[in-house]
Amino acid sequence: SIAYMKLLLEIGSEVDILSKQLCSIIDCNFNTEQSKMPTYCRTIDRMLPNFRNDSVIIRRKHEFTPWLKVFEHCGNQNAEYSWWQIYNGVKHNRNACEYGNLPTYKMSNQQNVLFALGALFQLEMYYLREVIKLYQLDNQIYPLQPIVSSSLFTLKSMSLYFERQTYSEYLFHDIRVRMI
């Protein structure tokens, strides 16, 4: 539908921007001028090896790995398509029949939008963790300020550290993240 297509375009654009930001934080030599998804994948794989296989959980019931097929496709153009390829197809060539008999824009469906949104959530959590590490915000001098947590998604790699009435703290690869 057109609504899914618009959502996919907006989410995909945010993923592109935040991927570049994450790569520039985790690799001080990252060239932001020459950046595309294959470059992001290589940098993230090298610096954050658990990222591609991390799972996003929807409302504590359904688990999926939104980045796995994206990373596989970055290394092998013949790999099964992912939400990222659909996003690019919609962005650059909406009416082409790149994925079977359907025009690309018809691949803008609930599943691809959900995978894109889960991928964006995962990126945001890793970005937050790297900012906390970079600026050493996980210590006694700078008490963590809570951020609003997602009512839809959680990351499998984030484990509950402790829970209070007003917020919860999670351990995310040894970094504390406080969420409301």
Locations of the language-model features?
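Acidic, Ser/Thr-rich low-complexity intrinsically disordered segments
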Residues: L144-I180
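Intrinsic-disorder-associated interaction segments
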Residues: M37, K106-N109, R164
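Short non-catalytic regulatory patches outside canonical folded cores
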Residues: V15-Q85, H92-C97
